[in-house]
Amino acid sequence: MGAMQAQNYSMVKWAVGMRLKSATIQTVEKALREGEILRTHVMRPTWHLVAAEDIRWMLKLSAQRIISANDSFAKGYDLDIPNELYTKAHDLLEKILCGKKSLTKQEIAEHFNRSGIVADNRRMTRFMARAEQEGIICSGEDRGSKFTYALLEERVPPMPELTKDESLA
């Protein structure tokens, strides 16, 4: 499947359905709900849909470049977050999402704020993007029109690790 990018969630689901034999909107939505297809920022700060089986090797190829670009951009907007704070945020994400829980960004922000991590919308975007890039979180099961996040390790079973050459092939 590769990665499919779109600004509009309905259109990217349609794009997936168009590329798969005998897919319907229902089968695409079921695959998203069950974590067979993930919604992520794997290649840049735009939504992509990827097959769950591909997420780890894609992150391995792209994450460091995306993290560096995001950090550079953030410094220009006074959004620089120290690595120690990312570590604290990641530890909290693992704690609050453990047990196959899926939470919205707003629910996660409430946990962050209660734990002393300032979690306004701009900072939450940074925390969530970094956690995605580091393979800590991925998309959870949507709640109506609200996106949720879950732990990658709980949502996607382990896959054989690919070499860089295999990933690029």
Predicted regions and their residues:
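Long, low-complexity intrinsically disordered regions
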Residues: 1-169
